[in-house]
Amino acid sequence: MWGYVHLISWVAIVVLTVTALAIYSKSTKGFTILQMINRIFYILVILSGVMMVQYSVEQSWILAIFKILMGIIVIGVVEMLLSYRKQQKPTGMFLMIFIIVVVITVSLGFYLSGGYPLFN
């Protein structure tokens, strides 16, 4: 069950982040609402990740620690990306880092879980 919560939360974070970036110029209030909803999903990701960490450590404790660090970095990059957007500063570098770090984190997550819950 925690695998599904984790996966859905990560997908929601990515979708909400991209949506917030896209609507900022049209609605700063909508942007702020999406940013707050994103933060709720951070809590779900952290909670579900803590519940699943024992399975990842069994697979490879080094990769599990690296994935935990990458997950924290993703959350930090999302926050920087959204705050730079709100301050109307250039976000290109953070967007590129966001894409790279998300791909690495998702790849590690599926490797450590053996593809669960997407590939049973």
From Swiss-Prot:
Location, primary (coarse class): membrane
Protein location: Cell membrane
Spans through the membrane: 3-23, 33-53, 62-82, 92-112
CC per GO annotation: plasma membrane
Keyword set, alphabetical order: Cell membrane, Membrane, Transmembrane, Transmembrane helix
Domain of life: Bacteria
Keyword DNA damage: no
Alphabetical list of NCBIfam families matching this protein: PRK13673.1-4
Family: Belongs to the UPF0344 family.
Descriptive protein name: UPF0344 protein lwe2280
Origin species: Listeria welshimeri serovar 6b (strain ATCC 35897 / DSM 20650 / CCUG 15529 / CIP 8149 / NCTC 11857 / SLCC 5334 / V8)
